Amino acid sequence: MKKILILSVCLFVCWALPAQQQRMKVACVGNSITYGTGLADRATQSYPVQLQKLLGEHYEVENFGKPGATLLNQGHRPYTRQEEYRKALDFAGDIVVIHLGINDTDPRDWPNYRDSFVTDYLNLMDTFRKVNPDVRIIIARMTPIADRHNRFLSGTRDWHGEIQTAIETVARYAGVQLIDFHEPLYPYPSLLPDAVHPTAEGAAIMAQTVYSAITGDYGGLQLSPLYTDNMVLQRDTPLLIHGTANVGEQV
């Protein structure tokens, strides 16, 4: 009887271990916005935590956000010199989601080192490829900075736009997936109470954006919210209709 019990336990463990090992590892790399600064409870409200809930048990999502981190290696707090970066490399994620650039709008950084941004970003991605050659990298257009920010008109607004363009350039050069954290948050400045850090609701929007990018699930075929009941459309004129659909869905 004891031998049968031991054999049963061994079989269960041997069956369970491969299931655990098959979990897809997702590394969320970023700054204080990824970390969850400003949230009442970052342990339950940060976007990586909410992403874990959306993706479910077949994924393992880890938060490697570092408050104040810059993408620029010559910035005032380079991400590549932080402990979170070393932990992210050790994690060797199957998927790496990068949201950096907000802190590079600092007047100490972008005006002086902007020419290094694209190269530094490409090099950062290469370090993740070295620890996992099969890694899937997703990079994000930055979340908005509201006009309440104390440096908004003295450079931050323009530099933020320039960095967005640089991030798009990085995506083209590297051939990686580009997602947009800016557009879904921009219409709702109330979700950025300190002008920079999203609320729990804002973090949920970020999590949903990443979830859709990873899984291809965009909620099925649907029109843009711009199109509402009883809206007036011009007749006898070709119209460009916007909307979303799941990846691979026939429209």
Question: PLM features: residue spans?
Answer:
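Bacterial Sec-dependent N-terminal signal peptides
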Residues: 1-21
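Catalytic His-Asp segment of secreted/periplasmic serine-dependent ester chemistry enzymes
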Residues: 39, 142-220
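Alpha-helical scaffolding segments of alpha/beta enzyme cores, especially the outer helices
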Residues: 116-119, 123-130, 162-169
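Non-catalytic, glycine-rich low-complexity segments
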Residues: 219-247
